[in-house]
């Protein structure tokens, strides 16, 4: 792997121990995957933020690092709402450790808006062809597929290393040859809303880590593409997909039709909706974090109603502050709008035995990461389950 003179000096420790560790990680990955050199990146998105997932060892490692990131960098969701952690019954001990983790990242110059949808934030723009070092699976999929940027599935340490250096190793999805579709997926039904999450859950299991190209009967919105990619990244390991006539590379590139073809039928999606579980104790929406359009829809569905089950709606703090009217309407129902975290990486979910989700990603992750059953429905079904379809009465305390 070719290194410039400056990069060799960094590897030799002449720029300090933190940068030596960082370039050592990237060079090791580059050697494993056959990278020819390091390339500059536009931004980094760093996983390994929740105390639930990284523990004391992770906190100690991050705290020992020095210096400042060279490119815009942002954090993945933490293990709690950083401003209102008590209402989800997070312990003070966990909260203290979580705050230490965020502060350790902040001292490195990293933006501490903890979200899995960084592409929605002001001042964190991503464009077609940009090279990135992102590490949250749904954000990787969105950047690669919906925007046409280029990032591998970075781990937390490699994304942080890339942020500190402003570079990453040139392999994988940074190269044209690895962005070519490997399997064609034909969907034999029209889709809307959470159907795309169900499709992603089914397709990910069939595709694994390959690059699919979809032939769809419906034209998906960006939130639906977000759901599709997030679910495929969770049930499989898909980091890049194409949709004929929709996603940018499928529109710009003249891809050859893959030899392998998969057909997915409505009955396979119905199996996701019909998954059996206990009566849900918790309703969760926003995995990945809700967009403005999704917050608006949740507010419309909850207006004038009262939830009778614990209901959490996750979004980024920036969007929650940008749309206070949606947040107010949602919370008047008794539902909680939660920022900085999600149902998967927060320990708060662990006290429930069955969780209803409108996300194929959460449907895949909740059983393994939270020890709960997951049942699936669209946003309207989730809110109907939360409210029992009941209108809020005059004088209701919510």
Curated annotation (Swiss-Prot):
Pathway: Isoprenoid biosynthesis; isopentenyl diphosphate biosynthesis via mevalonate pathway. Transmembrane segments: none annotated. (R)-5-phosphomevalonate binds at residues 48-50, 76-77, 136-137, 361. It is an enzyme of class 4 (lyase). Binds 1 [4Fe-4S] cluster per subunit. [4Fe-4S] cluster binds at residues 116, 287, 342. It catalyses: (R)-5-phosphomevalonate = (2E)-3-methyl-5-phosphooxypent-2-enoate + H2O. GO terms for molecular function: 4 iron, 4 sulfur cluster binding; lyase activity; metal ion binding. The keyword 4Fe-4S applies. Its EC number is 4.2.1.182. InterPro entries: PMDh-L-like_dom (IPR007506). Its cofactor is [4Fe-4S] cluster. Pfam families: AcnX. GO terms for biological process: isoprenoid biosynthetic process. The keyword Glycoprotein does not apply. Keywords: 4Fe-4S, Iron, Iron-sulfur, Isoprene biosynthesis, Lyase, Metal-binding. Component of a hydro-lyase that catalyzes the dehydration of mevalonate 5-phosphate (MVA5P) to form trans-anhydromevalonate 5-phosphate (tAHMP). Involved in the archaeal mevalonate (MVA) pathway, which provides fundamental precursors for isoprenoid biosynthesis, such as isopentenyl diphosphate (IPP) and dimethylallyl diphosphate (DMAPP). Heterodimer composed of a large subunit (PMDh-L) and a small subunit (PMDh-S). Belongs to the AcnX type II large subunit family. This is Phosphomevalonate dehydratase large subunit. The lineage of its organism: Archaea, Methanobacteriati, Methanobacteriota, Stenosarchaea group, Methanomicrobia.
